[in-house]
Amino acid sequence: MCDVTFHSNALNRDMQYRVVFPGHITAGERFPVVYLLHGGGGNFRNWSDWSDVARYAERGLILVMPEGSDSYWANSAGRPQDRYEDYVVNDLISDVEDKFSAAKDRANRAIVGVSMGGFGAVKLALSHPDLFAFAGGISSAIDVPRRPFSIKRPAQGLRHRLIFGAWGSQTRRDNDPYILVRFADPGRMPYLFLSCGEQEGLLRANREFAALLEERHLRYEFHVVPGGHTWTQWNERLPSLFDSMWKRIHPED
């Protein structure tokens, strides 16, 4: 495991990410890469500090955990310098593939997140289906661009307006996973793994999103599991997620 600092052109500043490697690497060998996005209020250390995700590297995976602040992993509508989507899909992937023994094709690339990161993982995969073969959203804040926070929670509404743009704006539509699915070509989309706890306020939105995936004939699976919105619960969902992922990404020939 190591922490990397690199310069992001999209953000015009240095950023950090954590990497976990397979235990045995031979010269010339390339490994699938899983990008793990943290949730709101978190940081790039959360995945390795609060879960046992590192053990899945032993399956022959490179795990990458980038810093994302509270960005929702989106290009901010109100702060042009905060282009977090571009940072991930352009700068981060390029840096990882330049520095490490990473496979460089879609079939060997996955993206996964929890909460805010679950939204980010699903949204980035739907927006860039040429980059990812698999996306996993655990307890995803999947409906956040369509929540009228400005009415009941003004401070949060202002922050979300800064990120996603005004209600009904094109930037908000561009960041709405429901709209992306509605106009998606099912044959081009990555496989989606969704999981949400029975005690979570996000369950209804995740059920609705899964129903839309079914309607649009996208490839997916959706699990409703016991528990709430905690790292303890998320850690328990990792075995089924990685088992599903392993069926859909593979090492380079």
Residue ranges and their predicted role:
Residues M1-D253:
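Non-catalytic cap/lid and distal C-terminal segments of serine-dependent acyl enzymes
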